[in-house]
C-alpha cells in the first residue's frame, strides 16, 4: 500500500526534510515563519513517535534556523543530531569569488557565512584565500576595491531571492546535493566541513539554531564560534539578535513555550 505523511519515515535513521511551503517571488524566508514552524512542530513530534532510532535529521525548509530549532525541540533529540542547511550561501560566495578572479572554484578556500540563513547572515571573508593568497590582502586594491567586496557580500545574502526572481521558484539542485552530503557524513562518510546550522547555547549565544564553524560526522555536529574581524563579529551578533526576535515571536504564536520551559519538552536542551 502507499505510505502517506508520517508513515513514510517510520523507523528511519536518517532524515532530510524539505516539507514546508516554498518561498515565492517577493517573499523573504522570514515570511514563512508561522506556517512552516507549525509544520516543523508536527515533524518533530512525529520523529519522536515514529523514529525512535533516528541518528540524524537535516532540515531544509525555511526559515531553516527556526524550523530546525522547532524540530529539535519537539523531537527530543540531542542538539548534535539535528542540523539545518546553511552551506548554500558559503558556496555562492565561493562561486562569486572564483568568477571574479578567473580561477577554479576549488582554488577559493575558507568561504563561510555564519549566523542566520537569511538576508541577515554574516558573510565572513577574513579566512578566505584566492589561489593561496589571503583575500584580505586583495580587498582594497585596484583589483578588488572595498566597494566591490561589499556589493558581493550583499549579493550573496540576497542570492536566494535572486534565484526566485529569475526562476519563479526556489533552487533545488544545490540544496539537494548539499543536504545529501550532510547525511552522507552523518552516516560515516567524509566529514562535512561547510557551515551548518546547529543548536548553540553558550555564554554569548543562547538557545538558538544558527550557522557556526561546524564539523558534521558520524558522531554528530560539533561547532566552534568563528573568529573574524570586528566588523564580521558585529555582523554575526546582529544576525543572532535577528534570530532571537523570530524565536521569541514563536513564543507569542504559541508554537513553542518560553525558553525557560524547553527542557520540560526536550531534556537534552
Residue ranges and their predicted role:
Residues 1-5, 10:
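Single conserved hydrophobic/aromatic residue that forms the stacking wall/gate
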Residues 75-81, 90-269:
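C-terminal substrate-binding/catalytic lobe of Rossmann-fold NAD(P)-dependent dehydrogenases
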Residues 19-21:
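Conserved NAD(P)H cofactor-binding loop of Rossmann-fold oxidoreductase domains
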Residues 28-96:
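Rossmann-like NAD(P)(H) cofactor-binding subdomain of soluble oxidoreductases
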Residues 10, 45-49, 184:
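Surface-exposed alpha-helical segments enriched in charged/polar residues
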